[in-house]
């Protein structure tokens, strides 16, 4: 199959990604937080947080899940929220804790949530 999208790539962009070299998505987030600490990470409405702040919030949420809710690796966490600044904090915090994120639609009825 011809992969015609490669024609639009700059010559410096590789056509293949070594996903094993990247680690987990949490590893990528943590590396980005270290490398781009003072750069904007997320913006929602009129609020922007940088990678350093995002990492602090993620670590705090991870601690909350483990120490207050006593969630363990493999436990599931249903996440029902709109596209807010808190969403990436919750997702990365849960993943960092080894918790499985189960995204749910805020418009689901109680019957659909069963």
Regions found by a protein language model. Name each.
Residues 1-2, 8-9, 33, 56, ...:
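Short low-complexity stretches enriched in small and charged residues
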Residues 1-22:
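Flexible, non-catalytic linker and terminal segments flanking ANL/adenylate-forming cores
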Residues 3-5, 27-50:
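AMP-dependent adenylate-forming
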Residues 17, 21, 38-92, 109-114:
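Conserved AMP-binding/adenylate-forming core of the ANL superfamily
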Residues 95:
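Anion (oxyanion) recognition and catalysis
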Residues 98:
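Structured binding elements
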Residues 104-106:
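Short beta->alpha connector loops at strand-helix junctions that form conserved
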């Amino acid at each position: 199959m011809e992969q015609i999208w490669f024609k639009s790539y700059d010559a410096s962009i590789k056509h293949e990604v070594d996903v094993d070299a990247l680690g987990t998505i949490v590893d990528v987030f943590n590396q980005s937080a270290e490398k781009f600490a003072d750069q904007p990470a997320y913006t929602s409405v009129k609020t922007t947080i940088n990678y350093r702040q995002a990492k602090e919030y993620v670590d705090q949420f991870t601690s909350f899940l483990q120490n207050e809710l006593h969630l363990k690796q493999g436990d599931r966490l249903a996440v029902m929220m709109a596209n807010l600044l808190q969403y990436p904090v919750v997702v990365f915090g849960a993943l960092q804790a080894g918790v499985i994120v189960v995204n749910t639609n805020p418009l689901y009825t109680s019957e659909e949530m069963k």
